[in-house]
C-alpha cells in the first residue's frame, strides 16, 4: 500500500509541475519545487513503519528509501525530456496551419487524374497534326492563288478585286465569337431566277469551286445596283468578311468535336495563327475566283435570252463587251465604232433598233438598212447614241450602265419642219462610242427590258 501511495504522490508532484509550466513559470522553478518536494518526502520516511512491526521499522525505512530513489530517478528523467516536449508543443500551431491547407491540397490531388487525361490527349498532335494541315492548306492556297486565264475579267476597273492579295490578321483579331452566327441565304429578288443562274454558274465554276445557290445570290447582289450599289473597295471588304465567316464555321465544327477541341486549345498561338490565316486566304481566294467568273459571264448568266438577235454580236460564248470590240475593230474605219445599232427616220419619229443582219458594200462606212423597219418595242434605247442624221440633230444621251443592266431613257427630239430628208449621215458623222459618253461595265451592254 505504501508503494502505491508513493507513486500517487509522485504523480501529483508531476501534475503540479505541469500546471506551473502551463502558467508561465520557467523550467528551473519546476526543478527547484520538485527538489523541495522530494526532500520533504525523504525527511518523513524514517518515521513511517508498518503496524505490528515497530522493531524492524529501520529496515522498512531503508527499503522505502531504495524504492523511492528509483522512482525519483524516473521522475528526473521525465523532467529532462520536458524541454523537448515544449518545443513540440510550440510547433503545433504551424502543424495546425498545414492541416488547414490539406483540403485544398486534396482538391488538387483530385484534379490530377483529369489533368493527366488531358495531357495524354494533347501530346504530339499540335506539332504533327496541325502542322500537316497547315502544309496542306498552303499547298492548296498556292494552287488557288490566281484565277484561271479563261476566267480572268477584262476591263471594268470599277469592279476590280485583286486576286493575288494575301491577308494576314494578328492573333488579337481572331477572337472568334460563335454566337449569333447566321448562314447566308438567297436574296428575295433573286428567288425567281436563282435556279437557272445557279445551275449555269456552277457549270462555269466547276467542281473545284462548287458554289452554292446562296453563294451565287451573295455575289449577284454585289453587281445588282437595285439591291446595294457597290464598288471594288466595298466588294473586297465583303469578300474578306465572308471568308472570315467561313473560318468561323470551320471553328464551330472544331468546337463541336471534343477530340479536336482539346488539340486545338493545346496548340501554340503561332501555329493557330498560321492555320487561321491560311484558312482565311483559301476561302478568300475561292470567293475572288467565283467573283471574277460571275463578273465575266454575268450577261450570259442573267440576261442572255434564247433568241440570238438580242445578244450583241450573236456570240453566246464570250462577253458582250468583247464581241462589240471585235466587230467594231474589224468592220469599221474607226477602232471603237459600234455597228450594232443605227438611228432610223420614219416620218416624224426616230426609232432605235438593234440590227440582226448586216450587209456591207465596198464602202466600209456604209451600212445598208433592212427592207422592213422593225417596230419600236420600248421608249428606252438599247445604246445611248449621239449622232447627226442629215440636218436632224440628235442630242447626246448620257447614260450610266449600272451593274444590274443598262438603264437609260431616250428623250424624243422634234426635228425642224423645213427638213424632210430621210438619208443617213455621211461617213464623217459616223456614230462613235466616245460621243455617247458611255461607262462600260464588264457585264456588257444590254437592256433587260428588251428580253
Curated annotation (Swiss-Prot):
The keyword Secreted applies. Residues 305-323 have a biased composition (Polar residues). Keywords: Host nucleus, Secreted, Signal, Virulence. Residues 1-17 form the signal peptide. It is found in: Secreted; Host nucleus. GO terms for cellular component: extracellular region; host cell nucleus. A motif (RxLR-dEER) lies at residues 48-65. The keyword Chloroplast does not apply. Residues 303-336 are annotated as: Disordered. Secreted effector that completely suppresses the host cell death induced by cell death-inducing proteins. Belongs to the RxLR effector family. The RxLR-dEER motif acts to carry the protein into the host cell cytoplasm through binding to cell surface phosphatidylinositol-3-phosphate. This is Secreted RxLR effector protein 70. The gene is RXLR70.
